[in-house]
Each structure stands twice: as structure tokens, then as C-alpha cells.
Amino acid sequence: MDAANARGSRVLFFGRHCRLSAVPLRALIDAGANLVGVVVPAPPRPGPHATPIRRREPRRGPKLPLAGKAHGPALDSLAAEVAAPMFEVTDLRATATRHALAETAPDVIAVSCFPLWIPPEVRSLATRGAVNVHPSLLPRHRGPDPLFWVYRCGDTHTGVTVHLLTDRLDAGDIVAQRTIPVEPGLPGDVLEARCAEVGADLLVQVVAQAAIGALRPRPQPTTGASYEGWPEDDDLKIDPEWTCTRAWHFARGILPLGYQPWFTDGRRTFIISHVTGVRPGIFVGELVQRGPRGAAIQLADGVLDAEITEGGNDR
């Protein structure tokens, strides 16, 4: 599909200030899509009566590159390049919200990393379809943070799916999908960056297809589906029965995503801030041995070398 077909398509974009939103939005702008608005969750404000939607008109500014390891510019900086309005929302079901968004007259609603459920009265504003970019191979890892669960489950590959928005989260028909390998020890922020780039490419293709009525949705498979919520404390625990390679891969993955794995010897809890490698062998004595260069954590088949801090009594 020629991405040039995306040029001129009226796109209302939903996201938040993160790489998985900024990179696809950058791609839509570069492809020539007509960005008619950017919707983000409103920041918390004091007071009991929050306005359901607030419109801000950004001033036109210079084109900004995406930062390397940072999450890129805030979405309002990208919107300002093409003088697109920003909408901060607290209630997507409010009449005022629907009326304000209806004025943008979108052909396509494009969503990537937006944390709020989008109701049908908003989805229906798009005359050519409403789609979401999800960083997993749906139907596996539905939910708010699939990248964490890729590492928790030890997946050797994942991917990105663009699907139609429906009442059920992450369950709409698939319109585009691509696989991404997950190599041993791949840092989570690198995987996130890969997903953002693939998602951006797929989204531009999907908008181009929607512009000429060429979307070909297919139902998600009925097998292999999973849904995981936000990780809880126990999900961050490294089990002493794990192999050292599994623990190393898990920690390397989730630390750059903002999570801190932990380990317990049954009496004390140790928070892991960095992992430096693995070594074969088993030592006798404490499960955690400290040294001048960090700590050695005994696992099922070897030792995980890490930097740790003691977190108090066993959880």
C-alpha cells in the first residue's frame, strides 16, 4: 500500500507523552496526514469539578527531532508543528467532549498508548475507522503494559498489532500486524523503541488503506489469548528456582521500563538496580553474597551478578 494515500487524511490522534505515542504521531505528520487534533489525558487538577475537555491552540513552531533515548518531544510540540489543537480530557463520555471532538470531523481516529477507554459515541466520529496501535502480537498480552509481560513470560518474539477499536479492550479485528524478535538480554527500552518504529510504519499504512476504503479486518484468533493488568509486586520477584539466564533477561528487560525486580533469601528482600552478568556454578551458604563489585545471587543453575540494595524484611 502506497503511504502517499495517507496524505490529506483527517486524523484525530489519541495518545500520551511517551515514545509509543510520539513516534507514530511523528510518522503521521511526516506522511502528510492532516492532523486535526491530538487528545491526551488531562493532568490532575485540584477541585471537585473537573472540566471534561479543555482545548488548547498551540502556536506553530519549528520541526523537532525525536530525542535518542528520551521519549521524544511532548505531543503538544509535535501538534504545534502543524498548528493542530490539543485536547486534554477527563471524561470521554461527556456531551461537551463529544461535541468538541466532533468539530474536528476526522476521517480516522488513531490511538497509540492512550490510557483511557474510548466510548462508541467518540469512535463513531471517524468516517473511515478508529484504530489502535498495540505493542504485542494480539491476542497475546492484551492489557496496559504488554512489554513487561513479554519479559515476565520469557517470550522470544513479540510484535505490534493495529486493530479496530471496539467496546472490549484490545480485542478488535486486526488490520495490520508484524513480528519483532526478542533476543536474550534485549533491554526493554530498545524493545519499546522497536515497537514504536514498527507501530509508526503500520499506522501510516493503515491510514493510507482507510483513505481509499481498503481496510481488510480479520478477527483475532480464538486461541492464544491472554490479558494481564498492571504488574503487581509479586510479578517483579525473581524466583530462586529460575535459571540465571532467565533472571538476567528479565531484569535487563524491565529495569529500563521503570520497574525494579527483587529477590529474597527468606529473611531479607534485595532490590536489584543493575545486572552485570551470569556465571555457572553453585556456592554453599547464603543465597546472596556481597562482594566489592556488587552481589552474587544464587539461582537454579548459576549465579546472577547484580547491584542491589537491601529492602528490609522479607515481603
Q: Can you name each region flagged by the protein language model?
A:
Residues 1-257, 262, 289-306, 310-314:
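One-carbon transfer enzymes
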Residues 273-280, 308-314:
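A short, sequence-level motif marking secondary-structure junctions
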Residues 276-290:
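A conserved acidic, glycine/proline-rich C-terminal tail/linker
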Residues 261-278:
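Short, structured protein-protein interaction patches enriched in aromatics and acidic/basic residues
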